[in-house]
Curated annotation (Swiss-Prot):
It is linked to Nestor-Guillermo progeria syndrome: An atypical progeroid syndrome characterized by normal development in the first years of life, later followed by the emergence of generalized lipoatrophy, severe osteoporosis, and marked osteolysis. The atrophic facial subcutaneous fat pad and the marked osteolysis of the maxilla and mandible result in a typical pseudosenile facial appearance with micrognathia, prominent subcutaneous venous patterning, a convex nasal ridge, and proptosis. Cognitive development is completely normal. Non-specific DNA-binding protein that plays key roles in mitotic nuclear reassembly, chromatin organization, DNA damage response, gene expression and intrinsic immunity against foreign DNA. Contains two non-specific double-stranded DNA (dsDNA)-binding sites which promote DNA cross-bridging. Plays a key role in nuclear membrane reformation at the end of mitosis by driving formation of a single nucleus in a spindle-independent manner. The modification Phosphothreonine is found at residues 2-3. Belongs to the BAF family. This is Barrier-to-autointegration factor. Ser-4 is the major site of phosphorylation as compared to Thr-2 and Thr-3. Phosphorylation on Thr-2; Thr-3 and Ser-4 disrupts its ability to bind DNA and reduces its ability to bind LEM domain-containing proteins. Non phosphorylated BAF seems to enhance binding between EMD and LMNA. Dephosphorylated by protein phosphatase 2A (PP2A) following interaction with ANKLE2/LEM4 during mitotic exit, leading to mitotic nuclear envelope reassembly. (Microbial infection) Phosphorylated by poxvirus B1 kinase (VPK1) on serine and threonine residues, leading to BANF1 relocalization to the cytoplasm, loss of dimerization and impaired DNA binding activity. Changing residue 9 to A: Reduces binding to dsDNA, LEMD3/MAN1 and histone H1/H3. Reduced interaction with PARP1.
Length: 89
């Protein structure tokens, strides 16, 4: 699977206070929807990812239900968080 520059940039360093829109698969529209639901930072979405025990199906379904992410967007976001966890946790 090839990854986007956004994905590579995200997983290359600690998350810190990065905005939710810095996650691969999350653009301006989805980012705004997530922010409206309290998921304003990438680390808050990471928390949900971890609560769901890094389960791909559960996380992607949650992302779809929460902000309307399509299959590619949810797959990109999941892959980004999974790779970040592999590198930093």
């Amino acid at each position: 699977m090839t990854t986007s520059q956004k994905h590579r940039d995200f997983v290359a360093e600690p998350m810190g206070e990065k905005p939710v829109g810095s996650l691969a698969g999350i653009g301006e529209v989805l980012g705004k929807k997530l922010e409206e639901r309290g998921f304003d930072k990438a680390y808050v979405v990471l928390g949900q990812f971890l609560v769901l025990k890094k389960d791909e199906d559960l996380f992607r379904e949650w992302l779809k239900d929460t902000c309307g992410a399509n299959a590619k967007q949810s797959r990109d976001c999941f892959g980004c968080l999974r790779e970040w966890c592999d590198a930093f946790l």
